[in-house]
Structures are given as C-alpha cells and as structure tokens.
C-alpha cells in the first residue's frame, strides 16, 4: 500500500518532493532521477531547484531518465519531451544535459513507419536504465483515466519500454500544450512500461484537482488492474502518493491517511 500524503496545494507537495530528492543527492551525488512531464511535477521541480540553489548542492553527477516521448516530433519541437525536460528540469537544476536521457532521443522525429528503428529504441532504453544502476526516485503524474507515463488503460502491468498508441482522452488532455488543437497531438509515443517503472526504488506520484479524484480513488482503494495502470503502485514496496484535498475527495479512508502521516516519525522521511 502506498503512503498517502494529503496537502493543501501543489507548492506544499513540491516542497516534500524537493526535500526528499535533495537529501538523496547529498547522500548519493550520482543519483538517478526518473523524470516526468506534464503540469503535475512543475512545482516539485521548482522546489527542488530552489533547495539546490539555497543549499549549494552539487548536482554535477546527477543522472536522469524521462518516462516517455512522442513519436514523430523532432527533438527541437517545443512540446517534445526532450525539449520540455530540458526547459523544466535540466536548466533550472543545472544538470549536465549529457546525463539526462529521453526514450525518443535516438529517434529525433523518426516517422512511425520506420518500424525497425523504433522497435529497437524501447529495449535499448531499458538496458540504459539498468546500466545506470536503476532509478532511485521516479516522479509520476496520473491521467484522468489512471494512466502513468503513456501506459493507457489496458497496458500490461509487466511491460517494458515500448511504442504505444495514445488514447483519445490522453490526446484531448494534452491538446492544451498544442494550441488546444487535438490534430497537432501525435497519435503514438514511446514510453517506459509499468514493469520498468516498478523497478524504481521509490515512486512518488503527484495529483491535483477534482479532475484526478476518480483516478486517485481507483489507484489507491480500487483493485489492482491493467485498466487503471497506476493501481500497480499498490504492489510497490516504496511508493508515495501526494495529493491535494480535491484529488483526495473520493478517498474513503482519507482521515486515516492524514492521521498516519501526521504521526509519522520525521526520521522516516517519505
């Protein structure tokens, strides 16, 4: 069962994540961070960047692996996840760009029709993560349908990094990054699988707003099912889910989650 932390707002969630990762980097200067895009992690990255600056933490050895990338977008496209990770993580934290990887880096706009090249990219990415020693902390968002990364409902809970077709709901949700034009949103992606994600030593999932309440309810208190990919976190030995009041609104046991976190010894961290 993941630890559930209910916070007032995204800034408070960001501070919890930022302190967790900053302490990790201090203890392990070559830490491997799992990175996600979307709006949910932004406050977390901002909080971490502030701590790194305020405490003069050396991040020169930190490595990173992103969750996913669109198929068909060149790396220079402003909404490619290569560009997004560089803009929201690499630059603010001062990471070495050569040590931060995105699954589509070797594809760089390769069209979907080039199946031979695309098919090899997923297994190669999993091998690169393993060669780095695995992910220490993986940050995650969650879709309104319970997807994590681009693992849509119905994805295998044992899957590795591979090419997937984006669900229509995901394309609708992501159209806000493409001038609200769904026709600009790619139809395919390459994503870490649930099996790959579950190998990370610590998972931290963030969710905010009433629109995520049903997905959080299914993730935390529903059954483990491929039709809610995030529900796999119930099986992880060290998973933390940080939500605001609106995202937690459908949780039946939220009073217990608050009680447990309030009485948790500080030395345990998250």
UniProtKB/Swiss-Prot annotation:
Gene3D superfamilies reported for this sequence: 3.40.50.1360
InterPro entries registered for this protein in UniProt: Glc/Gal-6P_isomerase, Glucosamine6P_isomerase, Glucosamine6P_isomerase_CS, NagB/RpiA_transferase-like
Alphabetized UniProt keyword annotations: Carbohydrate metabolism, Hydrolase
Family annotation (PANTHER family): GLUCOSAMINE-6-PHOSPHATE ISOMERASE (PTHR11280:SF5)
Name of this protein: Glucosamine-6-phosphate deaminase
Active site: 68, 145, 147, 152
Enzyme class: hydrolase
Transmembrane residue ranges: none
A GO CC term attached to the entry: cytoplasm
Domain of life: Bacteria
Substrates-to-products reaction catalysed: alpha-D-glucosamine 6-phosphate + H2O = beta-D-fructose 6-phosphate + NH4(+)
PROSITE patterns per UniProt: GLC_GALNAC_ISOMERASE
Molecular-function GO term, any one: glucosamine-6-phosphate deaminase activity
HAMAP family for the chain: GlcN6P_deamin
Function statement: Catalyzes the reversible isomerization-deamination of glucosamine 6-phosphate (GlcN6P) to form fructose 6-phosphate (Fru6P) and ammonium ion.
Involved pathway(s): Amino-sugar metabolism; N-acetylneuraminate degradation; D-fructose 6-phosphate from N-acetylneuraminate: step 5/5
Family: Belongs to the glucosamine/galactosamine-6-phosphate isomerase family. NagB subfamily.
Record EC number: 3.5.99.6
Gene: nagB
Organism: Bifidobacterium longum (strain DJO10A)
BP terms from Gene Ontology: carbohydrate metabolic process; glucosamine catabolic process; N-acetylglucosamine catabolic process; N-acetylneuraminate catabolic process
């Amino acid at each position: 069962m993941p630890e559930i932390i209910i916070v007032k707002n995204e800034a408070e969630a960001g501070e919890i994540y930022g302190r967790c990762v900053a302490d990790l980097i201090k203890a392990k200067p070559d830490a491997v961070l799992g990175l996600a895009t979307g709006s949910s992690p932004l406050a977390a990255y901002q909080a971490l960047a502030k701590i790194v600056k305020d405490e003069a933490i050396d991040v020169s050895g930190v490595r990173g692996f992103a969750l996913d990338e669109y198929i068909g977008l060149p790396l220079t496209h402003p909404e490619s996840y290569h560009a997004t990770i560089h803009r929201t993580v690499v630059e603010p934290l001062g990471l070495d760009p050569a040590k931060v990887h995105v699954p589509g880096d070797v594809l760089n706009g390769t069209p979907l029709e080039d199946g031979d090249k695309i098919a090899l990219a997923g297994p190669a990415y999993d091998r690169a993560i393993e060669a780095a020693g695995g992910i220490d902390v993986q940050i995650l968002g969650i879709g309104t349908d319970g997807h994590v990364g681009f693992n849509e409902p119905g994805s295998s809970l044992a899957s590795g990094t591979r090419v997937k077709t984006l669900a229509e709901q995901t394309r609708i949700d992501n159209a806000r990054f493409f001038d609200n034009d769904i026709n600009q949103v790619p139809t395919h992606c390459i994503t870490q699988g649930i099996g790959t994600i579950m190998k990370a030593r610590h998972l931290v999932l963030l969710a905010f707003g009433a629109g995520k309440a049903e997905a959080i309810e299914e993730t935390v208190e529903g059954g483990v099912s491929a039709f809610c990919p995030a529900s796999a976190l119930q099986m992880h030995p060290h998973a933390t889910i940080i939500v605001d009041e609106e995202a937690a609104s459908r949780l039946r046991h939220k009073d217990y989650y608050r009680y447990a976190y309030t009485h948790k010894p500080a030395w345990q961290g998250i």
